[in-house]
Amino acid sequence: MNIRLFKVGLIVISISSCSNKTVQESLLTIDTLLQNKADTLLTTSMIEHQATSGKAIIMETATGYIKAMVGLERKDTLSPFQPTTDFCTPYPTEQRQIATLLAALETGKISLSDTVDVGEGIYISDSDTIKDHNWHRGGYGKITVEWAIAANSRIGEVLIRERAFDDNKSEYEAAIGQIGYGKPDSVKGLDCILNTDVAASKISPIQLITFYNAIANHGRMVQPQLYKDSVAIINPQIASKASIDSVCQTLERTITEGLGKRANTDKTKVAGKGGTIQIGNPDDLTYIMDFCGYFPTNNPRYTILVILEKQGLPASGHIHAAGLFRKIVEQLIQNK
């Protein structure tokens, strides 16, 4: 079969040769109107927050069909935007917290109502100093497991992991793999090999949205698709219904009471979580902000991931990325 590159909007997809462009486009899951809307929203957000890189992916929850996939980058805030098609490279993110919670719940050693003591927001683990975002305000102290995730406590994640898996890193990483965090290994139409670095909290954008989509699907993980093929199942049930329900409850609380309030909208009920990672040296700090979630919560139709990268503060996944997530949700509702 002859395969070539085919451009739709701002993404390039490898596609079988066909007789005409109309036939080619009809094979793809991309919604051209939605692709253009997502591009506009991403561009506006990047200008507003002075971001140098940004990505947005919209996936149909039940099928795994990718309805929009936009990537933009620029050398600095004065340079023009250029499209990027890299949705496969693992990037550092705090989103592993959700995978840690689900894997821990599956052991039966952890429940949402259990408490963890994150103290004053500073914790030493394996010679690494871990700080919560509010460490300079005295930290959270004793909190429930559910609130640790909803409040984006890095220390909370470590304590949850330690309680469920002790110091057995190989057992933890195996448990993370068991629930599908880091799947799939490839996507037809994306010319890349997908990798995940659990130990370094790195995962590719397409793998992260696939994991969240499985949670939205009540544990059913479907293969992300750029072609209108039949739905392909990666795993019919990544975890028990009880554990999935607990994670969904936590993601909903993140929106209503936790750090994800900026993603909330009065047009529908959403669930999701954000994160912020600082990279680079102290003289040239770069921040990677993301937010991933789904809606509506009672019967999810779409799963969305947004990622923004910028130099310097202010930078927050639960503010900047969450705001873009909300705008995409409202655009999808408007398009109905």
Q: What does each model-identified segment do?
A:
Residues 13-25:
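Bacterial Sec-dependent signal peptides at the C-terminal "C-region" and cleavage site
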Residues 29-96, 108-109, 127-128, 194:
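Short pre-catalytic segments that frame enzyme active sites
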Residues 37-38, 64, 88-116, 148, ...:
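Active-site SXXK
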Residues 62, 110-113, 118-172, 233-245:
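Conserved catalytic neighborhood of penicillin-recognizing serine enzymes
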Residues 70, 86-95, 183-233:
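Active-site-proximal helix/loop microenvironment
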Residues 79, 105-126, 219-228:
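Short, well-structured active-site flanking segments
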Residues 127-141, 165-204:
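Mid-domain, small-residue-enriched loop/turn segments at the edges of structured enzyme/sensor domains
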Residues 223-224, 228-336:
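Conserved SxxK-family serine transpeptidase/carboxypeptidase catalytic domain
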